[in-house]
């Protein structure tokens, strides 16, 4: 019978057709827009982590709550937990030391220096996909073990901080002296949607190490934190893994010494678990049934826990004292001959064939086994450069301890940004170059000083476009992921930023502002750069008939060149900045997607992005001085002309060539070219969400609102890195 017949039959019997069948009628079910249009612009990325998802409310102050924490008592509770073995997940050798170190490592290890995303800073290991990654098997148990402590201390300690602190306490409990701990990681309440984990659709899909340099990916296989411990694509070859190891650790900003220290230090304690084949392992937490209550990977092998546990499928114990810190990793690495073998689960690993049975069994004191290692552990012996470092650590355990302490601190704090964000009693005093250190303030400009400086800037001969452009160039390097970049430090005046193509305006404007700073000696160059933007915007608003005072918070400082890691700051150079109509490469995504990416890094909402682009276009802030997107006959006036003319049906847009990157807007009647535009301009008329926002500012009653909204969004960007104001 046809569908029509079925419907007719239902109606004729008086039954409601909408109450029949098993279709999912819940909210959000059914075919979504992205199913129809998979290339749909991800404007939604700008609306994540809003107050609507935060149960703590807008007034919650984590730094204030943390100050109430009994930090010593918390660490005491964590220490006690380490040896409080639970029957539902028994501790190896009666200690959770290795488990908690792995939890902290895998939380922090998703960080990628290329785009600043990932890392432990927001407690993302609680959410998909990380909570169910193949490399994170059994870390659901670690987080569940921590729950009674989190429940006890409540909002005085975030999950994000607790994960890392638990790893630190585990190291300390093993007899290791850590470098310190900085709290300040604030939880979010939903998964990060902006992190690009890769295009692969299957877990453990292999990537060539060279590809990692071209994309913001942290691992050589989908679903891993770093590299495949069995070698690239399960090759079992230690030497071939060297390139993959360097690529992944290098993407976190680690050099060879830090890489060796982290691998060896992380594998000095604990074990891997591979009691039987992976076919015994059930669904991950996201796919597990509701009664599992967020736990996954239930095993049908034996008891499923303890000696029967299956995690990675590898069954490796590296050292003779797996719950106490030692130098046995390097001693065993070089002392014995290693033969490739397989774990009970069938995974490739190595065994010390000429070693006695010196490794204690985790659950039976009467049993011992030979030392075992991962394929990638042996890379530290057989790669020539790694081998040199490893032998030095073998012969100088104190050098190894110092290197691991510093590398572990860097690993677990790399995405926290400047040290001004750190809180707690164990923050190290030493400034580290990867923290982008800043000097102490030299100036405290008064309100009178600021008024005089603004007058001097206004009289300097700089145009509105130049003043606004230089301020944006200074502040817009900020990345919300790892809190790097921004205007504080005036690193626009230093290498490498001063020489970036996108910052061409700096060559013209900075000499003027630097001379003014030296002459007045009342404020830092960083403050004067931002103040120039204030002057430019106030002039542009006044020209539009709106009198407005742009808020300005002095107190920025000027970094020195020796406080600036040129290689690491080079990663902040944009491949595109749609706010300035800049694009360096055409082989990476679309121009409009890169605009969204930039706005998301700047923590902007969709309305904030919209108003900033519209305002900057009419102020003529394109990086190269082009007229693309400058839809106005009165540049330098903070008007709504960009929106009004973009949405004006008098103009018809067509690409100028096959690249579809540059467009001409012609008068439909005369055929005359009126405007030119890029994709970063036209997207505000083509994308339905952005067009809806553009229409707000194109209305006749929107002018004053536009100016106020522009100023608010502008000030937000200028202050993104003002952690000294927290």
Curated annotation (Swiss-Prot):
The keyword Cell membrane does not apply. It comes from the Bacteria. GO terms for cellular component: cytosol. Formation of the three residue Trp-Tyr-Met cross-link is important for the catalase, but not the peroxidase activity of the enzyme. Residues 1-33 are annotated as: Disordered. There is a cross-link at residues 226-252 (Tryptophyl-tyrosyl-methioninium (Tyr-Met) (with W-105)). The record marks 102 as: Transition state stabilizer. Binds 1 heme b (iron(II)-protoporphyrin IX) group per dimer. Pfam families: peroxidase. The active site is at 106 (proton acceptor). GO terms for molecular function: catalase activity; heme binding; metal ion binding. Its cofactor is heme b. Homodimer or homotetramer. This is Catalase-peroxidase. It comes from Salmonella paratyphi A (strain AKU_12601).
């Amino acid at each position: 019978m046809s569908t029509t017949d079925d419907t007719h039959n239902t109606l004729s019997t008086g039954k409601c057709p909408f109450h029949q069948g098993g279709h999912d009628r819940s909210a959000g079910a059914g075919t979504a827009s992205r199913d129809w249009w998979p290339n749909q612009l991800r404007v939604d990325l700008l609306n994540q982590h809003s107050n609507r998802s935060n149960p703590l409310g807008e007034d919650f102050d984590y730094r204030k709550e943390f100050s109430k924490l009994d930090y010593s008592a918390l660490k005491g509770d964590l220490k006690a937990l380490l040896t409080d073995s639970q029957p539902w997940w028994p501790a190896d050798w009666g200690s959770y030391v290795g488990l908690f170190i792995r939890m902290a490592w895998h939380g922090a290890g998703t960080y990628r220096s290329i785009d600043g995303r990932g890392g432990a800073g927001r407690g993302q290991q609680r959410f998909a996909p990380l909570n169910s990654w193949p490399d994170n098997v059994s870390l659901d148990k670690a987080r569940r073990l921590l729950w009674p402590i989190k429940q006890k201390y409540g909002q005085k300690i975030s999950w994000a901080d607790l994960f890392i602190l638990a790893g630190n306490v585990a190291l300390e409990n093993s007899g290791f002296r850590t470098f310190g701990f900085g709290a300040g990681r604030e939880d979010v309440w939903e998964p990060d949607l902006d992190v690009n984990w890769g295009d692969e659709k299957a877990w453990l899909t292999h990537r060539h190490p060279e590809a990692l340099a071209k994309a913001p990916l942290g691992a050589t296989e989908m679903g891993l934190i770093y590299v495949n411990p069995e070698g690239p694509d399960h090759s079992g070859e230690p030497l071939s893994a060297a390139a993959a190891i360097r690529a992944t650790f290098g993407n976190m900003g680690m050099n060879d010494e830090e890489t060796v220290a982290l691998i060896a230090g992380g594998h000095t304690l604990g074990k891997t678990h591979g009691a039987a084949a992976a076919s015994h392992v059930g669904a991950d937490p996201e796919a597990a049934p509701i009664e599992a209550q967020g736990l996954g990977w239930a095993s049908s092998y034996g008891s499923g826990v303890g000696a029967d546990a299956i995690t990675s499928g590898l069954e490796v114990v590296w050292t003779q004292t797996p719950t106490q810190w030692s130098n046995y990793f390097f001693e065993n690495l070089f002392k014995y001959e290693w033969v490739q073998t397989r774990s009970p689960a069938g995974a490739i690993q190595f065994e010390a064939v000429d070693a006695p049975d010196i490794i204690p069994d985790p659950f039976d004191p009467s049993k011992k086994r030979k030392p075992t290692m991962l394929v990638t552990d042996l890379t530290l012996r057989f790669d020539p450069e790694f081998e040199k470092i490893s032998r030095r650590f073998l012969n100088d355990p104190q050098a190894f301890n110092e290197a691991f302490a510093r590398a572990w601190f860097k690993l677990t704090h790399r995405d926290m940004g400047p040290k001004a964000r750190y809180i707690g009693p164990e923050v190290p005093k030493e400034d580290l170059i990867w923290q982008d250190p800043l000097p102490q303030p030299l100036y405290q400009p008064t309100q009178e000083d600021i008024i005089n400086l603004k007058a001097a800037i206004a009289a300097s001969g700089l145009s509105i476009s130049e003043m606004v452009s230089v301020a944006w160039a200074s502040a817009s390097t900020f990345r919300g992921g790892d809190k790097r970049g921004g205007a504080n430090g005036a690193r626009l005046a230093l290498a490498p930023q001063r020489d970036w193509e996108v910052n061409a305006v700096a060559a013209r404007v900075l000499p003027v502002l630097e001379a003014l700073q030296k002459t007045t000696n009342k404020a830092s160059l960083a403050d004067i750069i931002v103040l120039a933007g204030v002057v430019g915007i106030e002039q542009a608003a006044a020209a539009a008939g709106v009198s407005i005072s742009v808020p300005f918070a002095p107190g920025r400082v000027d970094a020195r060149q020796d406080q600036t890691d040129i290689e690491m700051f080079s990663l902040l150079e944009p491949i595109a900045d749609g706010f300035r109509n800049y694009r360096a490469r055409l082989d990476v995504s679309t121009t409009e997607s890169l605009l969204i990416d930039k706005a998301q890094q700047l923590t902007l909402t969709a309305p904030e992005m919209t108003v900033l682009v519209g305002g900057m276009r009419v102020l003529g802030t394109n990086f190269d001085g082009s007229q693309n997107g400058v839809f106005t006959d009165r540049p330098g006036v903070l008007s709504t002309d960009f929106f009004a003319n973009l949405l004006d049906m008098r103009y018809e847009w067509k690409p100028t060539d096959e690249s579809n990157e540059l467009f001409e807007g012609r008068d439909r009647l005369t055929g005359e070219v009126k405007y030119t535009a890029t994709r970063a301009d036209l997207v505000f008329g083509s994308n339905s969400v952005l067009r809806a926002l553009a229409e707000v500012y194109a209305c006749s009653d929107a002018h004053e609102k536009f100016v106020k909204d522009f100023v608010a969004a502008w000030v937000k960007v200028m202050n993104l890195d003002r952690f000294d104001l927290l």
